[in-house]
Curated annotation (Swiss-Prot):
This is Deoxyuridine 5'-triphosphate nucleotidohydrolase. Its cofactor is Mg(2+). It comes from Varicella-zoster virus (strain Dumas). It is an enzyme of class 3 (hydrolase). Pfam families: dUTPase. Involved in nucleotide metabolism: produces dUMP, the immediate precursor of thymidine nucleotides and decreases the intracellular concentration of dUTP to avoid uracil incorporation into viral DNA. Keywords: Hydrolase, Magnesium, Metal-binding, Nucleotide metabolism. It catalyses: dUTP + H2O = dUMP + diphosphate + H(+).
Amino acid sequence: MNEAVIDPILETAVNTGDMFCSQTIPNRCLKDTILIEVQPECADTLQCVLDDKVSRHQPLLLRNHKKLELPSEKSVTRGGFYMQQLELLVKSAPPNEYALLLIQCKDTALADEDNFFVANGVIDAGYRGVISALLYYRPGVTVILPGHLTIYLFPVKLRQSRLLPKNVLKHLDPIFKSIQVQPLSNSPSNYEKPVIPEFADISTVQQGQPLHRDSAEYHIDVPLTYKHIINPKRQEDAGYDICVPYNLYLKRNEFIKIVLPIIRDWDLQHPSINAYIFGRSSKSRSGIIVCPTAWPAGEHCKFYVYNLTGDDIRIKTGDRLAQVLLIDHNTQIHLKHNVLSNIAFPYAIRGKCGIPGVQWYFTKTLDLIATPSERGTRGFGSTDKETNDVDFLLKH
């Protein structure tokens, strides 16, 4: 069972004002241990506990115990939703071989949970700032009752793979054909277009130059102008960034499927790896939602994107749109490991999870005892601040 540890030495150091050093924590406590610091003001708004509905390997659960009035002065419009960034008043420091998934946790008995959603988030081991969640909710929502907003901090054990991507550009000569298909039955209700493009080479589409066409699909030649689709990562980063190899155009409220010309190769050294694609925090905050999904071995990199910015946009060639996490197959997350998902805000059912056997270590001095990191407190798109990769083509 996961064990929540509060070291009495840490409490004494904080209460007396004594200097504290990392040597206070024995080395044996640092392996498979996630440091957590709960801010004092958290008690006023959130309950922060280990989930007692899980018998072993418990995730950290955060739940509002006060009514949340909406929309607040911090809310902004995102397509047909409001969006608000919520500080969860918690800091974390996992080992480099772990990451935390931030996931909404639902109890099926609470019907109003279908009116507000939490964007899936990935917390890197190197992030030392206060963790925030992105809350999306429908315009008719004016209040979230106590206990109705529940969020998991869900640890996952990362794996390394020296054979992560197999670039197939040379096999495509170097043109890759996209396929447009009829929208799925569970596409968003406000979906306007008759087809879902996998590539968005809008100029080619508008010129009407399909190579093959029948009642269901047609193919378009898309020239690739950028070859570095998968970026390398720092040791403390959770995922490998996925870049778009062409200018990607999305109309407001458009819901598209993207297929990239790169295959996840089988890794004979580490066959017990599951790969999952998640969005990046900077894009989720701006309203560009990457639907979290699995990336099965032997298949092209595929995922859905939902434009909730409220504008027509262009994502530039080479922009980091998503990220892929390589997760130990023994970690059972809220996504199926072999299914392409088109759900914008997937959630976990409370009590049904399979996280690795980690120890939560609660402290009031995380900044003093945590391993130094390159990223520090910079979060929510800090690595994108020097670039403007998204053009808003039409203002409303």
